[in-house]
């Protein structure tokens, strides 16, 4: 079996920055708390919790009865709405903002466009943390999720009657789907449309790698958390190109791969390299695989 590694694997800059900063706080014995997962990777989150990180699903679930002088609130890589930020600053003496710089740039762009009179259309998932943080900064907006009905969007805009519309995206969405939505919006009559592709370049490059692996391999192993938007997207891209994609977090989740002569390996941007290495080693030793690095290193 030949095992082909994607050119880029592991954490992106924003995720690595957030994880390493959280580890430093925990090593300093800070009482670190966060609303939601730092990253959407179950293995990474278990390690951080084992180090002492306290994770709460929402603001109302935070227990303030045991806060101490060394307590610190963390704003995760996806960002937080201004209301949440203000609340944390009031209740904690120290707040560490680990919002990904690329995500923060999207927040700033959206606010600037709104100030210029644009009605904001967001291509993203309404329950995703990044989208929630973005919406908390805007006065009015429309979220367009995958699988949208464009006639419904047209009807909404006819009723809303905006003169100008600005399209932006959650940073981890599928770039091809974004472009298709942009193309449809640009055809609307009587509305000035500004298209702003705010999808992260790292995720766009991973999409291209997923397509390349699907075109050159018999199957592709996609390594990453089950709740990771960008990891799940890679698996869907592979399958859309007619190849089997196995979205796994550990070797135990892999099926029998003996029927495949060439298997690709790619990861989401919230997947640590040690997680990828475990799966690579398992495939290599189980199937006597030859690793083709293709520029990729683990």
From Swiss-Prot:
The keyword Oxidoreductase applies. (2E)-4-hydroxy-3-methylbut-2-enyl diphosphate binds at residues 40, 78, 128, 171, 228-230, 270. It is an enzyme of class 1 (oxidoreductase). It comes from Kosmotoga olearia (strain ATCC BAA-1733 / DSM 21960 / TBF 19.5.1). InterPro entries: LytB/IspH (IPR003451). Its EC number is 1.17.7.4. One of its GO terms (biological process) is dimethylallyl diphosphate biosynthetic process. Isopentenyl diphosphate binds at residues 40, 78, 128, 228-230, 270. Disulfide bonds: none annotated. Belongs to the IspH family. Dimethylallyl diphosphate binds at residues 40, 78, 128, 228-230, 270. This is 4-hydroxy-3-methylbut-2-enyl diphosphate reductase. Gene3D superfamilies: 3.40.50.11270, 4-hydroxy-3-methylbut-2-enyl diphosphate reductase, catalytic domain.
């Amino acid at each position: 079996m030949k095992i082909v590694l994607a050119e880029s694997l592991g954490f992106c800059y924003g995720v690595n920055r957030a994880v390493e900063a959280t580890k430093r706080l925990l090593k300093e014995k800070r009482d670190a708390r966060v609303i939601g997962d730092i990253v959407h990777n179950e293995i990474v989150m278990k390690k951080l919790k084992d180090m002492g990180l306290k994770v709460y699903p929402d603001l109302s679930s935070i227990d303030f009865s045991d806060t101490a002088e060394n307590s610190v609130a963390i704003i995760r890589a996806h960002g937080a709405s201004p209301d949440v930020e203000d609340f944390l600053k009031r209740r904690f003496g120290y707040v560490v903002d680990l919002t990904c710089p690329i995500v923060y740039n999207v927040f700033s762009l959206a606010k600037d466009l709104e100030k210029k009179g644009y009605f904001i259309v967001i291509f993203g998932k309404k329950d995703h943390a990044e989208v929630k943080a973005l919406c908390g900064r805007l006065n009015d907006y429309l979220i367009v999720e995958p699988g949208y009905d464009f006639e419904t969007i047209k009807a909404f805009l006819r009723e809303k009657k905006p003169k100008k519309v600005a399209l932006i995206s959650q940073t981890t969405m599928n770039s091809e789907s974004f472009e298709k939505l942009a193309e449809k919006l640009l055809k609307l009559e009587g509305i000035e449309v500004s298209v702003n592709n705010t999808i992260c370049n790292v995720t766009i490059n991973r999409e291209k790698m997923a397509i390349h692996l699907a075109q050159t391999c018999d199957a592709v192993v996609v390594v990453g958390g089950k709740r990771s938007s960008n990891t799940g997207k890679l698996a869907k891209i592979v399958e859309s190109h007619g190849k089997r994609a196995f979205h796994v977090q550990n070797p135990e989740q892999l099926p029998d791969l003996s029927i495949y002569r060439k298997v690709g390996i790619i990861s989401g941007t919230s997947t640590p390299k040690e997680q990828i290495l475990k799966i690579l080693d398992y495939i290599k030793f189980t199937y006597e695989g030859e690793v083709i690095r293709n520029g990729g290193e683990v």
